[in-house]
From Swiss-Prot:
Keywords: 4Fe-4S, Iron, Iron-sulfur, Isoprene biosynthesis, Metal-binding, Oxidoreductase. Its EC number is 1.17.7.3. The lineage of its organism: Bacteria, Pseudomonadati, Chlamydiota, Chlamydiia, Chlamydiales. This is 4-hydroxy-3-methylbut-2-en-1-yl diphosphate synthase (flavodoxin). It comes from Chlamydia trachomatis serovar D (strain ATCC VR-885 / DSM 19411 / UW-3/Cx). The keyword Translocase does not apply.
Length: 602
């Protein structure tokens, strides 16, 4: 299955789906969704959190339903919300227990199921091979087990989300398609076919992954396959287990922002570790920033044009030492910054230890300075550690001047800067120059009036969308906050799977199944391991329901198995189980040592 990418976009046309008192779809505003972190059986606490989420701007709220106790709790939660005149739709999250879905649909507005575990067994990597006959029999079994829920949802007018998660595909699907984007898409389509056959259409789809590159490719592919079949169902967007803090916001904005800018997505969630309340302002800012980007689309001559990313041209790295084939980061320094900054402070902002000369992993490869400042003492000091480019020596291409893009003067330069004002103009630039091997440095300026979160989201959405398609050779960032610029630059490169300079953390946002304080444990593990080399991925997951699957590409996993107990994973394999939580962090360090990735902090 080809992985498509989208060059021009309006919002993808979808059917309207009713969820309680609101509608989701292309003719309606994009809705914000979150999930409670309270135990669903804690009715009072769950209702309080739902009310708080609505006050902050959440449109749809989901609760976990593990079994019949949670089904009964949902009845009380819904009654309490009605009594308080709170109309926010209530969604039940189902894994492994179809009977819970059948019962809870009576009292909720929507049911979310995971095709990877609703009927089939989750893949346990046993190596089982399915014959064509066995595969066909499994599909018949799926129809028999899934159709009662479809029939009841249709009869009661309730909605459903078919939510596929990368890494938690069924054994049957993984055996045939692998743990791949193709497997994710076909997992969703198998369930979609049952819904279509039963003339049930109040369906929303999601294709989540903790890896934004996988997530974006999966949504693009599913949208293409659905539209080829004229199944115009809405999409719920999210980067699952995005983590916490700035890194979590960047991951979410790279994935969700890219798709929103392409016209995909009807509901969104930023799955950040910690209180779900913290997700809502980020979602609001993300919708605001991507709406402003979409207003600059102009008239797209081929709306929702899906094509191979190869049509846009391939990325050529700027082959200047010390880069080689490394995707580089440059920071623009203005004459004001160079004239007014304290030299030591400026070097430290760039990641250079002025005492030892040591370079931080997130130090940019170089800086761009005004030619008139090249001989200044501060630039001479910077040049001892980093590459220095004169701003006037390299063409800066105007995004509005297409003639300039292909001029002889432009094409004869060793490389060029292209100022990225919007995603679609940049894609057109690369499409017109697809036969050129000239390296292009993507130049981004950030509005100094943006708040920190707005700046993070704006840059992540604009830059991430291009990096995910392999466009550009390096990045030039121009922002008054130099330290924030380099931090964001490398986080976005890491989120786009282009370059990894620090440890990456995958951590779930928490829900009613969570067995420990996710935020506190995640922060402690980060503090103990953040000095380790880039390229390492560590997952911290609240429970074993989704944990082992959703940390699909993590190297090491810390997963709650039962109250007070932790399982440790290497890749998909549980290697240490039922460790008392007070010992688990030390056991994780020991596991890192056993696998040769640990080093003592300096």
């Amino acid at each position: 299955m080809a992985t498509p990418c989208i060059q021009n976009a309006f919002r993808r046309k979808t059917l309207p789906v009713r969820i309680g008192d609101l509608f989701v779809g292309s003719e309606h505003s994009i809705k914000i969704q979150s999930m409670t972190t309270t135990a669903t059986t804690d009715v009072d606490g769950t209702v309080r959190q739902i009310c708080a989420l609505q006050e902050w701007g959440c449109d749809i709220v989901r609760v976990t339903v593990q079994g019949l106790r949670e089904v009964h709790a949902c009845e009380h939660i819904k009654d309490r919300l009605i009594q308080q005149n709170i109309s926010i739709p209530l969604v039940a999250d189902i894994h492994f227990f179809p009977q819970a879905a059948i019962h809870v649909v009576d009292c909720v507005d929507k049911v979310r199921i995971n095709p990877g575990n609703y009927v089939d067994k989750r893949n346990m990597f046993t190596g089982k091979i399915y014959s064509d006959e066995q595969y066909a029999h499994s599909l018949e079994h799926l129809m028999n087990k899934f159709s009662p829920l479809v029939e009841k949802c249709k009869r009661l007018g309730k909605a459903m989300r078919i939510g596929v998660n990368h890494g938690s595909l069924s054994e049957r699907v993984t055996q045939r398609y692998g743990n791949t984007i193709e497997g994710m898409v076909y997992s969703a389509l198998e369930y979609a076919e049952v819904c279509v056959a039963m003339d049930y259409h109040d369906v929303i789809f999601s294709m989540k992954s903790s890896n934004p590159k996988v997530m974006v490719a999966a949504y693009r592919s599913l949208a293409y396959e659905l539209d080829q079949r004229e199944w115009s169902y809405p999409l719920h967007l999210g980067v699952t287990e995005a983590g916490s803090g700035t890194a979590g916001i960047v991951k979410s904005a790279v994935g969700i922002g890219t798709l929103l800018s392409e016209g995909l997505g009807d509901t969104i969630r930023c799955s950040l570790t910690g209180s779900p309340i913290n997700e809502i302002p980020i979602c609001i800012d993300l919708l605001k920033q991507t709406t402003e980007l979409s207003e600059r689309w102009g008239e797209a001559d081929n709306p929702f044009a899906i094509h191979s990313s190869k049509q846009l041209g391939t990325r050529n790295t700027l082959n200047t030492p010390p880069w080689g084939n490394v995707y580089g980061l440059l920071i623009n320094l203005t004459d004001v910054q160079l004239l007014t900054a304290e030299p030591i402070e400026l070097l430290q902002c760039l990641g250079i230890d002025t005492t030892t000369g040591k370079i931080d992993p997130t130090t940019p490869e170089g800086v761009v300075v005004p030619k008139a400042m090249r001989s200044s003492p501060i630039v001479s000091e910077i040049e001892k550690h980093l590459l220095v480019f004169n701003k006037e020596d390299v063409p800066i291409l105007n995004p509005m001047n297409e003639e300039e893009w292909l001029s002889e003067e432009t094409l004869s330069a060793p490389f060029v800067y292209f100022e990225v004002t919007d995603i679609h103009t940049a894609r057109r630039f690369f499409s017109l120059r697809q036969h050129s091997t000239q390296p292009v440095c993507l130049s981004f300026s950030l509005d100094p009036h943006l708040s920190k979160n707005e700046a993070i989201i704006d840059l992540s959405a604009r830059l991430g969308a291009l990096l995910l398609d392999g466009l550009g050779s390096c990045v030039l960032l121009d922002f008054v906050d130099i330290k924030l610029s380099r931090t964001l630059g490398f986080l976005i490169l890491q989120s786009a799977n282009i370059r990894s300079v620090t440890v990456e953390y995958v951590s779930c946002p928490g829900c009613g199944r969570t067995l420990f304080d996710l935020l506190a444990v995640s922060q402690r593990i980060r503090e103990r391991t953040q000095h380790l080399p880039g390229g390492l991925k560590i997952a911290v997951m609240g429970c074993i329901v989704n944990g082992p699957g959703e940390m699909a590409d993590a190297d090491f996993g810390y997963v709650g198995s039962k109250p007070g107990m932790i399982d440790l994973y290497v890749k998909h394999k549980c290697v240490k189980s039922c460790i008392p939580i007070e010992n688990a962090e030390e056991e994780l360090v020991q596991l890192l040592k056993e696998h040769g990735v640990w080093k003592e902090p300096e």
